[in-house]
């Protein structure tokens, strides 16, 4: 997020003021027994991977039960929707205003792909789709952020280094 601060911002209704956030409060869309809840992991930029994982577990467990404290539902700056958790493969995510971007992650699938020698091999594929507020973000910015994000998923040690 620090390389793409516009993704961690909000715009007012008449698009006359853009506010950048210092904290990265990442919303996690959860299919709960009372409907969609989006609690957020506060200040992700200040947490290590273990702290993020523990907070993710706490928030998703409480959200699934419909018992998320109100303070955990406020202040999100960008959201992630894991439609793969309920079997989905692709979706067009809907922006959680006043946020300006959201990503939807599909389920991991093993699909046939060609390798560098033209042979068909099984590859792990996850569909990722973004929605962004075009008053603030252009497609190129989202594409570059997505490429960086993809590189981190493919090389977790690089992600760990970036988080330190």
Language-model features: locations:
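C-terminal catalytic/motor cores of large multi-domain enzyme assemblies
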Residues: 2-164
């Amino acid at each position: 997020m620090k390389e793409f601060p516009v993704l961690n911002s909000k715009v007012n209704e008449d698009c006359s003021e853009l506010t950048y956030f210092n904290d990265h409060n990442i919303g996690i869309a959860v299919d709960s027994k009372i409907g969609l809840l989006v609690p957020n992991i506060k200040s992700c930029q200040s947490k290590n991977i273990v702290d993020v994982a523990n907070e993710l577990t706490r928030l998703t467990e409480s959200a699934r039960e419909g018992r998320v404290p109100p303070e955990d539902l406020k202040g999100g700056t960008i959201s992630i929707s894991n439609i793969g958790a309920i079997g989905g493969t692709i979706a067009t995510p809907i922006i959680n205003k006043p946020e300006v971007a959201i990503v939807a992650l599909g389920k991991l699938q093993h699909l046939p792909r060609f390798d560098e020698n033209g042979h068909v091999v099984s590859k792990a594929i996850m569909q990722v789709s973004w929605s962004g507020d075009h008053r603030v973000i252009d497609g190129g910015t989202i594409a570059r952020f997505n490429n960086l994000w993809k590189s981190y998923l493919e090389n977790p040690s690089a992600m760990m280094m970036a988080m330190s």
